[in-house]
């Protein structure tokens, strides 16, 4: 006969399950931000390429609130890149594309790491859920056995 179900073990497993679930939510949000950053960088690369081909052609420039104004890009090969801490550097169009491609590689590596962590957490969650199910079945069997006496 198996040892009786220890309520402390059940409570401990529930706590771990809650913690892992919260961690998974945080990592999932971070992964979503990485994926959004990659999409945004790819869109910026496409825009820079189109601007280089168009030269000094008029474009619609968003100004917020769903509004755009018609503008002419005077120097499409001058791109100003924010590198953080309110620091902006001037790059050529190709330099900006190269910078974005490097950032994409970094974000893809981070996304890969986050995915691996999420997979490990998911495996741990499944193990805990399996153990909890075993304990619940065992507790039910104990109750049924005690009720038949």
From Swiss-Prot:
Listed InterPro entries: PFD_alpha_archaea, Prefoldin, Prefoldin_subunit_alpha
Keyword match Chaperone? yes
Print the keywords alphabetically.
Chaperone, Cytoplasm
Which regions span the lipid bilayer?
none
Biological process, per Gene Ontology: protein folding
CDD domains given in the database record? Prefoldin_alpha_GimC
Where in the cell does this protein reside?
Answer: Cytoplasm
Mention any one GO cellular component term assigned to this protein in its UniProt record.
prefoldin complex
One GO MF term:
unfolded protein binding
The record describes the protein's role as: Molecular chaperone capable of stabilizing a range of proteins. Seems to fulfill an ATP-independent, HSP70-like function in archaeal de novo protein folding.
Family recorded in the similarity comment: Belongs to the prefoldin subunit alpha family.
| Assembly and binders | Heterohexamer of two alpha and four beta subunits.
This protein is called: Prefoldin subunit alpha
